Amino acid sequence: MFQNGLSSSPSNTTEPFSGPNFPLISIRDNVKAGYKLVTEVFGVKRIYGVVGFSMGAQQAFQWGVSYPNFVEKIVGIAGSAVEYPHGQVRLEGFIAAIQADNSFNEGNYNSPPEIGLRAGGAHWASWGWSQEWYRQGLYKEMELNSPSDVINWFEEFVLTWDANNLIALARTWQNNNVGNTPGFNGDYSKALKSIKAEVLYMPSETDMYFHIEALTQEAEKIPGVKLRIIPSLWGHIAGAGFSSDDAEFIDQEIKEFYK
């Protein structure tokens, strides 16, 4: 995915598009690049399945809209086809946490803005899992002993990333909307109804990034959809494989879907 530090990203692109000057990339841009790769480089004529978690799920749904005759089956795990207003505000909070560090210097930093990155990690720690996950102390299943340990865990994770890369990814996430695909004039309902692939739509019951009500409404608009809600207290992280129960549920549903 663009901006992840491996593909073209603010951290590895030369001037004039390096750092904070990196252009806004859409989910659709990522999917278009993937399509060109598999068709022009590998000569693939049709894809049997696309599977994605979180921003990968955003891409999976976009594959179905952008290339309706190219993909047979789509699995979207804990992700949406549209980023709704509350999610956009939440992401702005994450971005603001990083930018509040004086050493961020509008993205022109000489060393990682560690204070801002840690603040971003603390932000994510409050959103990644459900309230009940914290109340029941399920963090102990990750060999963590307290909510403070969870914050430290997420801070250390965020510190492994480049700040401009994270902000660029957040902007991509903020602006996601399959309705912006050419031909749909911003109408995401129409875009979802155009999907011809079979779709396994798997939201997490307690996801605080992608709210279950919005996702079930999205699923209802897709003609060939199979909605399977992950019955988990792990929030968004239910799709990341940390819980063996969640991983087993997801694996079994995908196996059944691909029969």
Where are these regions (language model features)?
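Short beta-strand/loop motif that positions the catalytic acidic residue
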Residues: 195, 201-203
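Catalytic active-site module of serine/aspartate enzymes centered on a nucleophile-bearing elbow/loop
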Residues: 216-220, 224-259
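Gly/Pro-rich cap/lid or specificity-loop segments adjacent to the active site
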Residues: 1-59, 65, 69-81, 86-91, ...
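Short, conserved loop/helix-junction motifs that constitute active-site signature segments
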Residues: 192-196, 220-223
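Conserved alpha/beta-hydrolase "acid-adjacent" motif
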Residues: 184, 208-214
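Alpha/beta-hydrolase-fold enzymes
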Residues: 70-156
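Active-site nucleophile elbow and catalytic-triad environment of alpha/beta-hydrolase enzymes
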Residues: 153, 168-191
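Detector for conserved single-position "signature" residues within domains
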Residues: 78, 96-103, 121, 202, ...
